[in-house]
Structure formats: structure tokens, C-alpha cells
């Protein structure tokens, strides 16, 4: 009952401008409260999660997962050739499947071109007008990604264009808004459908699924638990489902 009263009260609050809070914001606040109760259940003996029992508030509609095929991405990136920094940023996003904040926190020290690896151990945020580097989203997000040869070559070329670069300097001193505008420019110039920056991550996962990699292997690369990959992208595993059905046919026949 207390949680429901809290929900009703917060719905009545407004911003300093007089506007009501958006459904997405309300849902995010409720989710954070629910996480606190889940923590109390796990570590402090709380019996139930009252936030979960009360139900969510705000938007219940999750944003549709969109992704590009490899052919669509190649059309898009070809249109970005005239904007080098954005070009290389999108190359990393698509071929490595990292998060936007992880991309914007990258430094030269994160690249090992001899081993052809990229280390992910931090994230970038803009808070109260300041650039802030934080720890990654989850413990699983700390990872080392193997880069394909062509991407190693591209990034070494890019580093040569960055004069006076220090080991701890951000190699993409961009804002999230600049990335979004770059995406809009590339989509318009190439004629491919508009997707969100985060959908490049979905596109990377989709590509790996189509290449035949397991949920465990993909999860390790993108910083997700394999169960999350299976849950989020189950509809993209049609060949696996067909293989299961074929093997069940064999088992039944035997």
C-alpha cells in the first residue's frame, strides 16, 4: 500500500517547468526502487518485493528492437567516409557490439594492436555539464574483445590522425547527441532505415547469431549473461530451432 501511495504522489509531481514527468522516467524510477527491494531480499532477508507486487508505473511498452543487416550497415558506413571520427566510432560500435557509453570512454590504452584486442572497463556519461567516467554497467561488462584484422588496421590509421594523443585521452571526444546526429546524417545519405545508436549493438548480435555462434560466446563478447542473449534474441535463432526439431524427429524415430 505504501508503494502505491508513493506512486500516486510521484505522478502528481512536476518539473520546475510545470511539465509532468514522462512515462519512461516514471518507469525508470520505479525500476530503481524495485532493484533496491530485490537487493534487500537477496542480502537482508526481505520476504517480498513490494514494488513488484504494486506493479509498474509509466510506460510499459519496451522500445522495439531494430537492427541492420550487414548490407544495410555497409551502405550506411560508406556514407560516413567524409566524417572520419564518426566513421571510426560507428565501425567500433558495429563490429565490436559495445555500448555507446563504453565507446565514448575509450582511450589509446584500451587497445592492444599486437594481440588485436580491445579492453572495456569504463563508461562515459555527461552529468551536470561535466564529462564523467564511471565503472561499466555490470560486472560482466568488464571484458576484452578480440578485434578483426581490418578493424585493427583502421584504428591504427585513425590514431595517426590524432595529434598529441595521451594514453588516457578519449579517442572519441564526442557527445551522445553528436553520435545521434551522425546516425541521422548517415541514414539520410545512404537511404537505410533509421535506427537508434543502441540498435547497432543489436545488429552486431544479430550478425553473430547468423554466423552460427552460441549465446554463451556472444554473451562473453558483448558483456551479457548467455541467458539474457537467449531471452532477448530468441526470435533470431531460427536455425537452432530447426536443428532442435530435426534432432527430435531422429530421437522419436529411434
Each model region followed by its residue ranges:
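N-terminal core-binding DNA-recognition domain of tyrosine site-specific recombinases/integrases
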Residues: 1-47, 62, 84, 173-177, ...
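DNA/chromatin major-groove-contacting recognition/catalytic segments
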Residues: 75-79, 129-135, 235-254
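Active-site/catalytic core of tyrosine-dependent DNA strand-transfer enzymes
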Residues: 71-74, 123-126, 148-193
Amino acid at each position: 500500500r505504501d508503494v502505491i501511495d508513493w506512486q500516486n504522489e510521484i505522478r502528481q509531481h512536476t518539473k520546475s517547468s510545470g511539465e509532468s514527468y514522462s512515462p519512461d522516467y516514471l518507469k525508470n524510477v520505479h525500476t530503481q526502487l524495485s532493484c533496491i527491494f530485490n537487493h534487500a531480499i537477496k542480502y537482508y532477508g526481505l520476504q517480498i518485493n513490494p514494488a513488484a507486487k504494486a506493479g509498474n508505473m509509466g510506460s510499459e511498452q519496451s522500445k522495439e528492437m531494430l537492427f541492420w543487416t550487414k548490407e544495410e550497415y555497409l551502405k550506411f558506413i560508406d556514407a560516413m567516409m567524409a566524417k572520419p571520427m564518426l566513421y571510426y566510432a560507428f565501425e567500433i560500435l558495429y563490429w565490436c557490439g559495445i555500448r555507446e557509453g563504453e565507446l565514448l570512454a575509450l582511450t589509446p590504452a584500451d587497445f592492444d594492436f599486437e594481440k588485436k584486442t580491445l579492453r572495456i572497463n569504463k563508461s562515459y556519461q555527461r552529468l551536470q555539464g561535466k564529462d564523467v567516467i564511471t565503472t561499466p554497467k555490470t560486472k560482466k561488462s568488464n571484458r576484452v574483445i578480440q578485434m578483426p584484422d581490418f578493424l585493427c588496421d583502421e584504428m591504427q590509421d585513425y590514431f595517426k590522425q590524432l595529434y598529441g594523443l595521451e594514453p588516457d585521452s578519449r579517442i572519441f571526444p564526442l557527445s551522445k547527441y553528436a553520435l545521434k546526429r551522425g546516425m541521422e546524417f548517415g541514414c539520410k545519405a545512404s537511404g537505410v532505415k533509421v535506427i537508434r545508436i543502441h540498435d547497432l549493438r543489436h545488429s552486431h548480435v544479430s550478425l553473430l547469431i547468423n554466423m552460427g555462434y552460441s549465446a554463451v560466446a556472444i554473451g562473453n563478447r558483448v558483456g551479457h549473461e548467455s541467458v539474457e542473449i537467449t531471452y532477448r534474441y530468441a526470435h533470431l535463432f531460427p536455425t537452432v530451432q530447426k536443428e532442435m526439431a530435426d534432432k527430435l524427429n531422429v530421437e522419436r524415430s529411434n
